[in-house]
């Protein structure tokens, strides 16, 4: 099973983000290569046992086609741990409402604890936008009763520049189970998100990117400044976990760095 990380007398809720493998590498689909990459993903999931409270599977980050988050979750359930606590991102940019319902139903059937409904990055070919938006999607899913069977979460900016912005109000008014931040750079920004969510009874998950050399490019791509915690990410994560309901650790370009930080957290 996957266990909550225990630090001294405190228990914190830390999950880890895994990217499912790309479906196509190069220009052609290669089933043998895909199966090998799935094995690598499940091996990584196995290494996380005892270090995290759960695993979050992403959905085609940067618009690059990958194995679906729900299919990836099924592989982990079947081959690593049937009791693993898993959550899945679901992009709405590529889905209409019937397609979304199918995917959320699949997530429920494989035993995922939650789904993170997000817009998703624009695909490289820049083709296709279903017109569905995350807040509207959650509202429709709740109307259909999906929230009685799985937690419905929404993505949220790491820093709120305008609390009265319609996009912010929409996310709060639909009252998802949790708001999952983009990668945070400061505890003060996280505190503002928690304060916004609290009156609505919404939980907050703080996403923290591992400050490693190999993740610099990813940080630059999203404008993340990790100077506040680069020298001491362990304490930063501990503090974030006290403020928020949970922390989701991401290390997009270095699994080894993420694993090392998780091991430090457990000491």
List the predicted regions and their residue ranges.
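Conserved N-terminal beta1-alpha1 strand-loop-helix module at the mouth
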Residues: 2-57
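Conserved anion-binding
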Residues: 114-182, 188, 194, 198-220
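Glycine-rich, positively charged N-terminal anion/phosphate-binding segment
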Residues: 35-42, 63-80
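C-terminal extensions of enzymes
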Residues: 12, 237-266
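Hydrophobic faces of well-ordered beta-strands that scaffold small-molecule active sites
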Residues: 12-20, 53-57, 84-90, 115-117, ...
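Active-site-adjacent beta->alpha loops and helix N-cap segments on the catalytic face
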Residues: 64-75, 95-102, 121-141, 184-201, ...
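Catalytic-face loop-and-helix region of soluble metabolic enzyme cores
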Residues: 201-245
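Active-site mouth loops of central-metabolism enzymes
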Residues: 15-39, 86-98, 150-164, 218-231
């Amino acid at each position: 099973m996957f266990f909550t990380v225990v630090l001294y007398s405190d228990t914190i809720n830390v999950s880890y983000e895994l990217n499912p493998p790309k479906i196509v590498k190069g220009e052609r689909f290669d089933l043998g290569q895909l199966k090998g990459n799935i094995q690598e993903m499940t091996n990584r999931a196995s290494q996380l046992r005892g270090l995290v409270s759960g695993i979050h599977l992403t959905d085609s980050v940067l618009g690059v086609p990958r194995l679906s988050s729900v299919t990836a979750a099924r592989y982990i359930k079947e081959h690593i741990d049937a009791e693993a606590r898993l959550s899945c991102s679901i992009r709405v940019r590529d889905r209409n409402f019937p397609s979304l319902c199918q995917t959320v139903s699949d997530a429920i059937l494989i035993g995922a604890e939650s789904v993170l409904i997000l817009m998703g990055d624009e695909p490289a070919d820049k083709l296709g936008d279903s017109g569905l938006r995350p807040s509207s999607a959650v509202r429709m899913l709740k109307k259909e009763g999906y929230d009685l069977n799985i937690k419905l979460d929404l993505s949220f900016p790491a820093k709120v520049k305008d609390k009265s912005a319609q996009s912010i109000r929409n996310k709060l008014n639909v009252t998802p189970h949790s708001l999952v931040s983009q990668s945070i750079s400061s505890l003060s920004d996280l505190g503002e998100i928690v304060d916004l969510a609290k009156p609505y009874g919404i939980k907050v998950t703080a996403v923290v990117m591992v400050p490693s050399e190999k993740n610099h490019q990813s940080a630059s791509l999203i404008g993340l400044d990790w100077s506040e915690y680069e020298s001491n990410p362990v304490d930063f994560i501990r503090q974030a976990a006290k403020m928020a309901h949970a922390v989701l650790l991401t290390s997009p370009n270095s699994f080894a760095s993420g694993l090392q930080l998780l091991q430090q957290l457990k000491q």
